[in-house]
A protein has these predicted regions:
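Surface-exposed loop/turn elements that mediate protein-protein interactions on large endomembrane-trafficking
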Residues: 31-55, 61-95, 100-125, 140-168, ...
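Aromatic/hydrophobic beta-strand junction motif of beta-rich domains
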Residues: 62, 225, 539-541, 668-677, ...
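A short tyrosine-centered beta-strand micro-motif
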Residues: 719-729
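Structural signature of eukaryotic scaffold interfaces centered on beta-propeller domains
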Residues: 47-58, 89-94, 127-130, 172-178, ...
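Glycine-centered tight-turn motifs at strand-turn-strand junctions
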Residues: 691-718
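Secretory targeting and sorting signals
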Residues: 1-33
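C-terminal tail/sorting-segment detector
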Residues: 554, 728-748
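Short, compositionally biased P/S/T/A/G/V-rich stretches that sit at domain boundaries
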Residues: 342-344, 638-668, 744-748
């Protein structure tokens, strides 16, 4: 994929509180006035700290921008800087604050803190190479370097650099931590050498010969010159052999010399090397960590300092100024925090009050917590990297992600990436943290996930007839295929697989625990459904693009006709959402009262049209939640409240079995209850005589309650026996009564 779009900005619209690093976001223009106003937005931010470019840096401050972007250039001024009393081309040290710009044969120089200006004219036949302070470096047709400077009368002085070996081909003009010198790398006799031009008199001196063309970095200041991990003092007598600095290799490089310290680190932030910025003393050989978690280039400044980026994450990524102290050491100070960078969303899922977003720019998956109304209530959270199949450009429905309502989400991954044929696939379940995944091999190619709940995920392969149900026990990294069947319209809700029957309108429920039929429903559909979805007691069916569609309520045995069409629809709790791919309207049909009432909740951008499943640029939370969609602004996702009351709290499936050794500290009892919507919970453990032994409380992860008991009573004692547990769950949305469940567990 070629789309690339950083840690999240989150806004709650219509609320008083705005989260840290948040900006209040208005309703997208295309969604007004026909659509509902979002209750909030989130912006997906890159989890990778960005490289920073410095268009200019000097004694009074610097300019920075995100590398490779069209973002504006930001200007930073150093606190306490005092401009010099005199500045100009006749005072080379004052050049540490000069900004040079070139247009054709003219170089304009401006002293940033005093506004003193000068203009240079590049002589005919010379090529501009570099600018350092009040000096500009050019090269004539013979390859000889020249130093240009403005004279008091407005003319340009031209000094030929002396001392470059005859026949040398200059390959690089290098700026360092000095306004008095410029570095030259040259090739002679097939070998590289490096040295300095003294800008005061134009004299060149070679300091290091036989430079490795792989390690040809050059760093210097007014004290030291370093090339190819060989260091020598600038004022050393001619012919002084450089000192070899051992023990360092690619991808570690040296960036700058500050005082007597060589700054060493790694450009990459992909785990190839130690991320710390190290200061190596060129006097003693000792090293110390100057900055932790520092990536990207360290850039020398002509005033002898340097700029580096560091921080624990992109959310706390900063520019540091490294300055020399009086004794030649290097000290760092934080100067400015770098703003995060929004990146595009390539997959979107919503379930149990959590919004999941995927970016193919190396971000992987992230999640955002939402409250009961759909408002964002937390920062962007890392949910792990991905081994996705490759996807066509512009298809935001690929890769697919399906929220499971228990804090996890599922996707399809292939053994290898093959755009034409795909690879043997697995269903990959992420979470509930960024490190835990469950991978189940399904063996088909180019398949998808039409749905899933908790531990069960439905997979449809691209091969004719392939349909499987994956059982991924929560908390385990091991799963299995529990059902392999001939493909029909089907859906998983809780521990039941609902599938089209053999006659028109017939839907059969299969228990995934017992593999037995638990229900046969006559929905009234005049066909064998081509699409079937189940949420709570609702069954949605469709007879195809040109046929009718409806919803059947298993509780009331009531059937409701709903809008049909060629575009995919998604069933949620009491409502159905369908995208009109002609008008790009996202339409919600509320059927919970038995009557179908349709309204437009969003108008989607006309670009990035999903070619496959309904997921990608919009998603619904079938676990008592709402609707999310891409606004068209890079990385931005809006959440709109469904306006439909959720069903009462109910259990979908559970695992409360006690281990063979009972509850222990090493192997605690870890029951799990999958509910149909988020809740807070209290788990009371009592003796059979009714005495309370322990009370545990918490909030569901998604819509799943997970508890852990080590067998100890509240007083810390362990008493063997059978204990009665009672789970009381209260719905987070305050709609409907609390749910109470009971059972037994053992302490041996």
């Amino acid at each position: 994929m070629t789309r690339s779009r950083r840690i999240a900005r989150v806004a709650a619209i219509g609320g008083a509180a705005v989260l840290a690093c948040a900006t209040l976001t208005t309703v997208p223009a295309q969604a007004v006035p026909r659509a509902d106003a979002p209750v909030g937005t989130v912006t997906l931010q890159s989890k990778r700290a960005d490289w920073i470019d410095y268009p200019w840096l000097g004694a009074s401050g610097f300019e920075w921008k995100h590398s490779g972007s069209n973002d504006p250039v930001h200007q930073v001024d150093y606190d306490g800087f005092v401009p010099p009393t005199h500045a100009g081309p006749d005072d080379l040290p004052s050049g540490t604050d000069v900004v040079s710009t070139r247009s054709g044969s003219t170089v304009t120089q401006k002293h940033r803190s005093t506004s003193v200006a000068a203009t240079l004219t590049i002589p005919a036949g010379q090529t501009y190479k570099q600018a350092v302070g009040w000096s500009a470096l050019t090269e004539d047709a013979s390859g000889i370097p020249h130093i240009l400077r403005a004279a008091a009368d407005g003319t340009t002085t031209d000094r030929v650099v002396k001392g470059v070996p005859a026949g040398a081909e200059i390959t690089e003009y290098v700026k360092g931590g000095s306004v008095r010198s410029v570095g030259l790398v040259y090739k002679l006799g097939g070998k590289l050498s490096a040295g300095l031009v003294d800008l005061r008199d134009g004299a060149f001196r070679t300091y290091v010969t036989d430079v490795d063309d792989v390690h040809d970095d050059v760093s210097f200041n007014d004290r030291w010159f370093v090339a190819d991990w060989k260091a020598v003092r600038v004022d050393a007598p001619p012919g002084t052999a450089p000192t070899v600095l051992g023990g360092w290799d690619f991808p570690v490089t040296h960036f700058a010399v500050v005082g007597d310290q060589l700054l060493i680190g790694s450009v990459s932030n992909y785990g190839e090397a130690d991320p710390d910025l190290i200061a190596l003393s060129l006097v003693t050989g000792d090293t110390e960590t100057l900055l932790n978690e520092s990536y990207g280039y360290v850039t020398p400044s002509p005033d002898g300092s340097a700029l580096a980026t560091a921080g624990p994450s992109a959310l706390d990524w900063n520019v540091y100024r490294v300055k020399p102290s009086a004794d030649g050491a290097a000290v760092s100070e934080k100067v400015v925090r770098i703003s995060t960078k929004a990146i595009g969303v390539e997959a979107l899922a919503l379930g149990g009050g959590e919004l999941f977003a995927y970016s193919d720019s190396g971000n992987g998956f992230s999640s955002f917590a939402l409250d009961a109304t759909g408002r964002p209530v937390g920062p962007q959270t890392d949910r792990g990297q991905s081994n996705m199949v490759d996807c066509p450009d512009g298809d935001v429905g690929c890769p697919q992600a399906e929220a499971l309502g228990d804090g996890r989400f599922a996707s399809v991954t292939s053994k290898w990436v093959d755009m034409d044929n795909g690879g043997p696939e697995s269903v990959l379940i992420y979470g509930p943290d960024a490190k835990t995944t469950t991978k189940v091999y399904v063996g088909d190619r180019l398949g998808g996930i039409p749905g899933g709940t908790g531990r069960y995920v439905l997979y449809n392969g691209a091969s004719p007839g392939v349909q499987k149900v994956v059982d991924s026990v929560t908390g385990s990294t091991v799963g299995r295929v529990t059902v392999s069947r001939t493909r029909t319209a089907a859906s998983v809700w809780g521990q039941v697989l609902w599938a089209a029957g053999t006659t028109n309108g017939s839907v059969v429920g299969l228990s995934l625990r017992t593999n037995r039929t638990v229900a046969t429903i006559a929905t009234g559909a005049p066909c064998k459904p081509t699409d079937l979805q189940a949420v709570n007691t609702w069954l949605y069916w469709s007879c195809g693009a040109r046929g009718p569609a409806g919803v059947y309520d298993r509780a009331t045995k009531r059937a409701v006709k709903v809008p049909s069409g060629a575009s995919p629809a998604r069933l949620a709790d009491g409502y159905l959402v369908r995208e009109d791919r002609t008008t790009h309207e996202l339409r919600l049909t509320d059927f919970h009262t038995g009557q179908a009432i349709t309204r437009t909740v969003a108008v989607l951008p006309a670009t990035d049209v999903t070619r496959g499943a309904s997921g990608g640029r919009w998603a619904v939370d079938k676990f008592g939640g709402h609707i999310a969609y891409l606004t068209g602004t890079a990385g931005e996702v809006a959440i709109v409240n469904s306006g439909v009351p959720a069903s009462g709290l109910a259990q979908l499936e559970a695992d409360t079995a006690t281990g063979v050794d009972g509850a222990t500290s090493a192997n605690p009892w870890q029951p799990r209850w999958q509910l149909n919507k988020p809740a807070s919970w209290t788990l009371t453990l009592s003796t059979r005589a009714g005495r309370t032994a322990r009370v545990l409380t918490g909030r569901s992860t998604g819509a799943a309650v997970r508890a852990s008991w080590n067998g100890l009573r509240a007083d810390g004692t362990r008493v063997k026996g059978t204990y009665v547990w009672k789970l009381t769950a209260k719905p987070r949305d305050a709609q409907g009564p609390a749910l109470t469940l009971t059972g037994e567990t053992n302490v041996y």
